[in-house]
Amino acid sequence: NTPFRTKFDDDMAKFSGNAGIGCISDTDPQPLLVRSHLGMFAISTVGIINNAEQLVAETFSGPGHQFMAMSSGKINTTELTAALINQRGSLIDGIRYAQEVIDGSCTILLLTPDAIIAARDRLGRLPVLVGRNNDGLCVSFESFAYHKLGYQDHYELGPGEIVKMTADGLTQLAAPGTKMKICAFLWTYYGYPNSNYEGVNVEVMRYRNGEIMARDEI
């Protein structure tokens, strides 16, 4: 129960509904609420867009586009991702388009009036895990985050896979790809010891790496 969580204690009593998304971002204020021809949705992303300037220039080349959210003088990459999604006729086609044109990594979480849509980046550099308990589903970058809340591992998205979560369960909207380039630093540096990625526990992997390093020194 960190100071970050307690900041929202008073707000929780005012919330209604049965779904929500959130993000702790080092760079961009998010989630963002977007109203477009695709309807209203909230969006949160995690990753690095290497060709952001190119995509911004291409988006500005058409009429009716503007970016409002700025972070340190730069375009908010979550807003850029939303702009890419809005260039197609449906949320799913828009997500697939964003996955296709983004150079780098971008995992996407959308909240619509009736569902949560999760999309792992096309090469699976970052994990997306779904937990489940008797009350519903949750989705997270780290499995330990929902373990502490009483959820059990339910599903792990593959590269580029898109799923929809509702009160009725989990539905696959786009099948996973075959190419996987998951970030190795998840096990060696970034990951929480209790977390599992692609079925491999972070703490177990670190002990194994230590054994290999020690063996090579003998």
Q: Each predicted region: which residue ranges?
A:
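Conserved short alpha-helical segments that host acidic/polar catalytic motifs at enzyme active sites
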Residues: N1-P159, K164-I218
